[in-house]
Amino acid sequence: MKSATRSATTAFFIPQETGAIRPIGGISKRSFDVLIAILALIALSPLFLLVMGLVKFSDGGSIFYGHRRIGHNGQTFKCLKFRTMMENGDRVLQEFFKSNPAAYEEWRTTRKLQDDPRVTVVGSVLRKLSLDELPQLLNIIRGEMSIVGPRPVVEDELELYDSAAEFYLRSRPGLTGLWQISGRNDVSYATRVAFDTHYVQNWSLLADLVIVFKTIPAVCLSRGSY
């Protein structure tokens, strides 16, 4: 019996009965992930609580936001973030696109907007400092994500990977990665795909450590974040 959350006709669906590929890094990478995630949650718990309060009291809405992403072997999971957008964000975005065709083209090609009308005041600060992604430490502990790896994508984005999608699917999506330390939104999507492919093809635990350490100045300087 197939165990998956998507239709068998989906291009990136990999049924478990075919012998799904184990994620890169094996037990050493998984042990590294769990250790770092637990230590980070403990160390950052005061900041975690502070952000929760800021998000809640800024507009009274929900604290967390979960969006379906494609994970290892094509299985979907709910990627967690602190909510940075208005609760009626989808409607706001569609109205914005009607009068801003250039913004729609930016969204269509990059899945990002430099001036996103949905983002709240508190949310813009959280995004700039990448604090909105802290809840993904819980995704890591649950085994849905890794500390280092390709950033989680939606199905439409994975189609942009074309033949390189197979490399994305070999790894758990990461909290950080080559893309984050190399300019993030300042680089093209094709370059992002190339980074992800290179990472998976050349994975090592040492490389993960280097990326983690390089993430700290990248986040502090807000390189390519918006």
UniProtKB/Swiss-Prot annotation:
Please give the coiled-coil regions recorded for this protein: none
GO BP annotation list: polysaccharide biosynthetic process
Top-level taxon of the source organism: Bacteria
- State the organism of origin: Sinorhizobium fredii (strain NBRC 101917 / NGR234)
Protein name in the entry: Exopolysaccharide production protein ExoY
> Gene that codes for this?
exoY
A molecular function (GO) held by this record is:
phosphotransferase activity, for other substituted phosphate groups
Question: According to Swiss-Prot or TrEMBL, what is its membrane topology?
Answer: Single-pass membrane protein
Its annotated function is as follows: Needed for the addition of the first sugar (galactose) to the isoprenoid carrier. May function as a sugar transferase.
What family is this protein classified in? Belongs to the bacterial sugar transferase family.
- Which UniProt keywords are present, listed alphabetically? Cell membrane, Exopolysaccharide synthesis, Membrane, Plasmid, Transferase, Transmembrane, Transmembrane helix
> Which Pfam families would you find in this protein's record?
Bac_transf
Per the UniProt record, which residue ranges are transmembrane? 34-54
Q: In which pathway does it act?
A: Glycan metabolism; exopolysaccharide biosynthesis
Q: Where in the cell is it found?
A: Cell membrane
Supply one GO CC term from the record.
plasma membrane
